[in-house]
């Protein structure tokens, strides 16, 4: 029970220090990274010990404090330690520690350094409290606390209008899901009379067996519970907050998209799976939402120019795979993919942060420029360690063996054939799209030449950028008109440009290299002509996550053909429900696995090959810019191809028009209603009052 509260002293002490000793606390601000990392490391040791106990004994530990208010009602609080809890605790602590170490250097220049670490530690506390909750009331309390922390971190740079709007958007979107979650919790309490998971599952199963419940009402309550997971895990149609959440600092993006906020929805569905399994319509609904999100996220990622938004849509698609697996009843595959994806995606986000950090020395603090992949390119020469790390994370997400995501995604793809051939075809096709858009991000960022110095060529004939679109080396003028980010004014300033600091370079010279931890004063960030590799404090977490990306997939591999349950993950999840694997247990062997693996890897390589053809280095030869435009030929086939590209580009660029629909329908109608209410209040209500007052003069 002490696990959630171990990181809590850090935000409390920072708050007290800023209140009582603000000057001293700010002077020693870099000191607070150490206790944050230390306390989370202690939690990681506890979580590792619990995980080992789970693997060895398959025990489930529950401790409950009961507070009896009267004979009819008692409030129970407690902690539940089972395989799901231990898996999530390990994820939160390991990813959290790497992000905290990384943030010490990444946020060193920021005036909100102390506030950042206070939020991060409280975020870890809230998430650990959520995964150890033993009842729905505790789940809801910590659910809201995690939401509060994520809103604070998304809007961390709240003076930027985009960040403030993104924070509000995330808040409003999640309010919809959270309200549904609350109604669902109250509905199941009305049905069963209990909030405790064990009692809830047992009572509900008995009611279903004895046919003592209204199936329509039960389905409605389950759908409301699922609405909370849909919003938090950015599933269709409540996914619209996710790309805007990229306005927060990059370490926050890594934490939110790897192990915390977006994992909440998957955790909730996994925790309540015994409840959902006895309601077939809900399981079908979960898998339907999952497969829609898989395809939608992949198509929206195809033409993103912002490196973080591209990774955000990738996260959305991968979460769809997990939700699809849960809807199919493949509990083990869903959690396996949650584990492997967390480390790979954290690696990708921290790698992108390293790239952004190095680009800021050239373009200044301007997210529109420093995160724009069109202005990158050729970074493999300047940031080699980051490049290798990012490439490994990319290949893992593409599903290339023997990296982590290959093993888990392959399980989900194979299970989808047992569930529905239509869903399987969509899932396999999206695997190819995943390889395409992930390798596109890698090629635009690291291959070719540094494009930031060629932005003056854009939009004019007979120049390199005339026929360069976000789709690769060539396209029609029609697409180029939409390509606004190529025409960025290089002289535009940002609010934060004058408030950006950099560690003292002299200490690096005295130490003979990059310092591992900088406890020094700060000065203005110096402009450079070319990017440079990040400090060791930022590279060390990348190397740790590379190791997990390489080896964590072996948790779920069974090296014995006769028994599937000899792998570590199956022992870990022994008491859990896994419907599809019970059906397919006898069919699973190395021959079947190799046959499916060869097919999935072939699809992934096809996506990589297509991305390489479209996005291979554009400036391989500068001798004749007209050569780049030479393949743009007129004709019916080319015209048809341009129309398809334009359609796909507009679909991705406009976010499938879902944001536009929400803005015109919901936002517009609410504003219209508010204006009507305002008119009625000022003209009618106030008019009656004022009219009576005026009439009194004539009476």
UniProtKB/Swiss-Prot annotation:
Pfam families: Proton_antipo_C, Proton_antipo_M, Proton_antipo_N
E.C. number(s) listed in UniProt: 7.1.1.-
Chloroplast listed as a keyword: yes
GO cellular component, one term: chloroplast thylakoid membrane
Record GO biological process: ATP synthesis coupled electron transport; electron transport coupled proton transport
Thylakoid among keywords: yes
Domain of life: Eukaryota
Membrane topology note: Multi-pass membrane protein
Broad class of enzyme this protein falls into: translocase
Catalytic activity line of the entry: a plastoquinone + NADH + (n+1) H(+)(in) = a plastoquinol + NAD(+) + n H(+)(out); a plastoquinone + NADPH + (n+1) H(+)(in) = a plastoquinol + NADP(+) + n H(+)(out)
Keywords: Chloroplast, Membrane, NAD, NADP, Plastid, Plastoquinone, Quinone, Thylakoid, Translocase, Transmembrane, Transmembrane helix, Transport
UniProt cross-references to InterPro entries, sorted A to Z: NADH_UbQ_OxRdtase_chlpt_su5_C, NADHpl_OxRdtase_5_subgr, ND/Mrp_TM, NU5C-like, Proton_antipo_N
GO molecular function: NADH dehydrogenase (ubiquinone) activity; quinone binding
Subcellular locations according to the entry: Plastid, Chloroplast thylakoid membrane
Homology family: Belongs to the complex I subunit 5 family.
Subunit structure as annotated in this protein's UniProt entry: NDH is composed of at least 16 different subunits, 5 of which are encoded in the nucleus.
Annotated function: NDH shuttles electrons from NAD(P)H:plastoquinone, via FMN and iron-sulfur (Fe-S) centers, to quinones in the photosynthetic chain and possibly in a chloroplast respiratory chain. The immediate electron acceptor for the enzyme in this species is believed to be plastoquinone. Couples the redox reaction to proton translocation, and thus conserves the redox energy in a proton gradient.
NCBIfam families found in the cross-reference section: NDH_I_L (TIGR01974), PRK06590.1 (NF005141)
Protein name: NAD(P)H-quinone oxidoreductase subunit 5, chloroplastic
UniProt source species: Digitalis grandiflora (Yellow foxglove)
């Amino acid at each position: 029970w002490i696990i959630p509260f171990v990181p809590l002293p850090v935000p409390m002490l920072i708050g007290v220090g800023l209140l009582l000793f603000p000057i001293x606390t700010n002077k020693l601000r870099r000191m607070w990274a150490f206790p944050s990392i230390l306390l989370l490391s202690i939690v990681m040791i506890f979580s590792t010990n619990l995980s080992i106990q789970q693997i060895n004994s398959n025990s489930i530990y529950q401790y409950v404090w009961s507070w009896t208010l009267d004979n009819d009602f008692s409030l129970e609080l407690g902690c539940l330690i089972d395989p799901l809890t231990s898996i999530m605790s390990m994820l939160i602590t390991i990813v959290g520690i790497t992000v905290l170490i990384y943030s010490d250097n990444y946020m060193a220049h920021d005036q909100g350094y102390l506030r950042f670490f206070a939020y991060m530690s409280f975020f870890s506390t809230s998430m650990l409290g959520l995964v150890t909750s033993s009842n729905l009331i505790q789940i809801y309390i910590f659910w809201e606390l995690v939401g509060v922390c994520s809103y604070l971190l998304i809007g961390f740079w709240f003076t930027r209008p985009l960040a403030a709007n993104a924070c509000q958007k995330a808040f409003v979107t999640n309010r919809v899901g959270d309200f549904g979650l609350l109604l669902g919790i109250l509905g199941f309490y009305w049905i069963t009379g209990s909030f405790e998971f064990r009692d809830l599952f047992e009572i509900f199963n008995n009611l279903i067996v004895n046919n003592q419940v209204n199936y329509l009402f039960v389905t409605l309550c389950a759908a409301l519970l699922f609405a909370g997971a849909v919003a938090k895990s950015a599933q269709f149609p409540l996914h619209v907050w996710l790309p805007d959440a990229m306005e927060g600092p990059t370490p926050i993006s890594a934490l939110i998209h790897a192990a915390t906020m977006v994992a909440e929805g998957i955790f909730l569905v996994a925790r309540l799976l015994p409840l959902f399994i006895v309601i077939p319509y809900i399981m079908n609904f979960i898998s339907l939402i999952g497969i829609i999100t898989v395809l939608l996220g992949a198509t929206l990622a195809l033409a993103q120019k912002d490196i973080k938004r591209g990774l955000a849509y990738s996260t959305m698609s991968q979460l769809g795979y997990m939700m699809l697996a849960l809807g199919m009843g493949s509990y083990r595959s869903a959690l396996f993919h949650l584990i492997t994806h967390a480390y790979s995606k954290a690696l990708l986000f921290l790698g992108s942060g390293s790239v952004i950090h190095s680009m800021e020395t050239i373009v200044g603090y301007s997210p529109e420029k420093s995160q724009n992949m069109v202005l990158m390119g050729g970074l493999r020469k300047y940031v080699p360690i980051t490049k290798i790390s990012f490439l490994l994370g990319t290949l893992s997400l593409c599903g290339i063996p023997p990296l982590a995501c290959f093993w888990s995604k392959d399980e989900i793809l194979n299970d989808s054939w047992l569930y529905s051939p239509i869903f399987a075809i969509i899932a396999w096709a999206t695997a190819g799209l995943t390889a395409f858009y992930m390798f596109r991000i890698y090629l635009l960022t690291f291959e070719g030449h540094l494009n930031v110095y060629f932005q003056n060529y854009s939009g004019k004939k007979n120049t390199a950028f005339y026929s360069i679109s976000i789709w690769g080396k060539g396209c029609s003028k029609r697409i180029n008109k939409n390509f606004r980010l190529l025409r960025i004014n290089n002289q535009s300033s940002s609010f934060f440009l004058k408030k950006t600091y950099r560690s003292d370079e002299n200490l690096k010279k005295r130490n003979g290299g990059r310092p591992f931890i900088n406890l020094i004063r700060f000065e203005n960030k110096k402009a450079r002509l070319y990017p440079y590799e990040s400090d060791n404090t930022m590279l060390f977490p990348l190397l740790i996550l590379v190791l997990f990306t390489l080896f964590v997939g072996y948790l779920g591999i069974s090296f014995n053909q006769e028994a599937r349950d000899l792998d570590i993950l199956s022992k870990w999840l022994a008491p859990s429900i896994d419907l599809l694997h019970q059906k397919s247990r006898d069919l699973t062997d190395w021959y079947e696995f190799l046959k499916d693996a060869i097919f999935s890897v072939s699809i992934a390589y096809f996506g990589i090959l297509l991305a390489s053809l479209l996005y291979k280095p554009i400036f391989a030869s500068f001798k004749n810019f007209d050569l780049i435009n030479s393949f743009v030929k007129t004709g019916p086939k080319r015209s048809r191809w341009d129309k398809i590209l334009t359609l796909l580009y507009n679909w991705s660029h406009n976010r499938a028009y879902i944001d536009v629909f929400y803005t015109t329908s919901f936002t517009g109608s609410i504003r219209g209603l508010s204006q009507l209410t305002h008119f009625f209040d000022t003209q009618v209500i106030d008019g009656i009052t004022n009219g009576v007052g005026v009439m009194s003069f004539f009476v």
